[in-house]
Regions:
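Extended, helix-rich architectural segments
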Residues: 1-160, 166-176
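A detector of the onset of the first functional module/processed chain
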Residues: 161-162, 183
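Extended, charged amphipathic alpha-helical segments
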Residues: 169-207
Length: 207
């Protein structure tokens, strides 16, 4: 047990209170805690019109967030932040749940920093993944004949998937990341994509 050295409730209550206060102060439930507005490069005479359009976009964004599992998962991430680093994964969903969030416990990942001391590599080990779940987890994955046979007929057999997100420094003028998924049973890459743009990293890491 990880809590066998805890002799009173001070730490447990303190972590819960820390996470609750942080959530209510930064990202309160059922509130619009951020706004999309025109930047300084937009001419002043066009800003009002653009801000009105962005206001509608902001409403839609927060409607999606509030109908997702963001509130629950960000609270767990803030609890991790109380004792170290919080990691929140944001992934594309489906028509019912357009966005899915997942709080990733720190023992499940390894973080590495780049030349500017920011986190630029995330290694996540996903254990006990059933082969017949791989298609749902990675819809755009390309399976080798060996893995495809396991996906179709492995039943409840499980594998470990290593996910890696790393910064692409060959594109210095744009924020770009590579995202890999490796099936550790065959040691082969089943999924690879390149993501560009600020916020393209699906792992949000904060300290």
């Amino acid at each position: 047990r990880r809590d066998d050295k805890i002799f009173d409730e001070t730490a447990v209550v303190g972590v819960q209170e820390f996470a609750s206060r942080l959530q209510s102060g930064l990202v309160p439930n059922f509130a619009r805690w951020a706004d999309l507005t025109a930047g300084s490069e937009i001419p002043k005479e066009n800003r009002e019109e653009i801000n009105n359009e962005l206001d509608e976009v902001t409403d839609y964004v927060f409607e999606v967030i509030q109908n997702s599992n963001f509130a629950q998962e960000v609270h767990e991430s803030f609890m991790d932040l109380a004792v170290g680093t919080g990691i929140l994964a944001c992934e594309e969903g489906d028509a019912i749940n357009p966005v899915r969030f997942a709080a990733i416990p720190l023992p499940h990942v390894i973080l590495d920093t780049g030349p500017d001391d920011s986190i630029d590599h995330v290694f996540r080990e996903r254990k006990n993944i059933r082969f017949n779940q791989l298609e749902q987890l990675y819809p755009k994955a390309k399976f080798s004949p060996e893995i495809n046979s396991m996906v179709q007929g492995a039943g409840d057999k499980t594998t470990t998937v290593l996910e890696i997100v790393c910064r692409n420094y060959q594109s210095p003028n744009v924020t770009a990341n590579f995202h890999y998924a490796i099936c550790m049973t065959t040691k082969s890459v089943i999924f690879k994509r390149e993501m560009e743009g600020l916020g393209s990293n699906p792992f949000i890491c904060f300290r």
